[in-house]
């Protein structure tokens, strides 16, 4: 699986989550996830990751995002560049995937676990791309109805996030 979701446990990542969720006008419940991508997970020929689908409206909050990563929403046929601390709303039922330029990713990574990165650090210490996926609780009308998916994705190619 090329996209790995886990709960936020790292104290520094929790702190980052708290900081930028408090700076935007959206409510989040405890279903906060981290998406980790490592270079070995990237399909360099295809430039895409596994498709994932959200069961609820979500707000995506990128933290340490290198240049060239985009979120593609298949139903809307749009690609949205991920920029640090710029939230993106994704409606429930949308099929999404992350895509990136065909450039070695680690050369452009900002390591969030170190305030002064050491150039001699092993590349294996890179923690991955940190993206927060928060489930939005507010009943805001701007989200509208959940998408009725017209795209059929085989189950083995799709990761459903509840």
Swiss-Prot record:
Main location: cytoplasm
Keywords noted in UniProt: Cytoplasm, Nucleus
Highest taxon in the source lineage: Eukaryota
GO cellular component: cytosol; nucleus
Subcellular localization: Cytoplasm; Nucleus
Keyword Nucleus: yes
Protein's name in the database: Uncharacterized protein C15A10.07
Species this chain originates from: Schizosaccharomyces pombe (strain 972 / ATCC 24843) (Fission yeast)
Biological classification of the source: Eukaryota, Fungi, Dikarya, Ascomycota, Taphrinomycotina
